Amino acid sequence: AGWLDRWYGLWTPSVLVMFAFFTASTDGLLRRRFMLSCVFLWGLGCWLYVALPALGPIYYVPEIWKDFAAKIPAASAMHEALWANYQKMLAGRNGVLREFNPIYAIAAMPSLHVAAHALFVLWSWRHARPIAWVFILATFLTFLGSLVTGWHYAVDGYAGILLAVASYRLAFVFERGEDRKSTRLNSSH
């Protein structure tokens, strides 16, 4: 479980690497489609958080994770920080909201961690097949890590994957055009 805790911590660097990889393309259509799919993913994901507010099982049934917390120290520390911030937000409902940090907000449905990696699978499969295999594994590990650490229920990950597929497809609807063959790093299409 400790290695999944550490894996989950690599999520942000993996996202930044993929942003850099696809936005460095000389194909303007690819860059626009990729970034538009990310806008859809994050934008729709945030609206789904508002429409379907949910906390992960770590917050709903914290006693399950008490004995397990030592095995996932990074997640446990973040659980506590996010929960403290959430309590400040709840206290702000009765007056002025003070000391709330929106970066430390809690939302579970859908899992945007799983969704982002799934979106990278779709883009890599089309344009950089060797990287796709890495992100298939990354999506699986992130999904598994989200369950083990208590951040998400399984349905949150499934919803994230569906959101990734929808975001990918919407990018093609709104940015029409033909792919340049030279942008594909894989030999099979």
Language-model features: locations:
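Divalent metal-coordination and catalytic microenvironments
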Residues: 12, 34, 53, 113, ...
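Membrane-interfacial alpha-helical segments at the cytosolic side of multi-pass membrane proteins
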Residues: 17-24, 114-132, 162-171
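Aromatic-anchored segments of alpha-helical transmembrane domains
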Residues: 42-50, 139-148
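Membrane-interfacial catalytic/cofactor-binding modules of polytopic membrane enzymes
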Residues: 51-126
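Interfacial helix-loop-helix junctions of multi-pass membrane proteins
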Residues: 56-57, 108, 141-167
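Conserved small/polar residues in nucleotide/adenosyl-binding loops
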Residues: 179-188
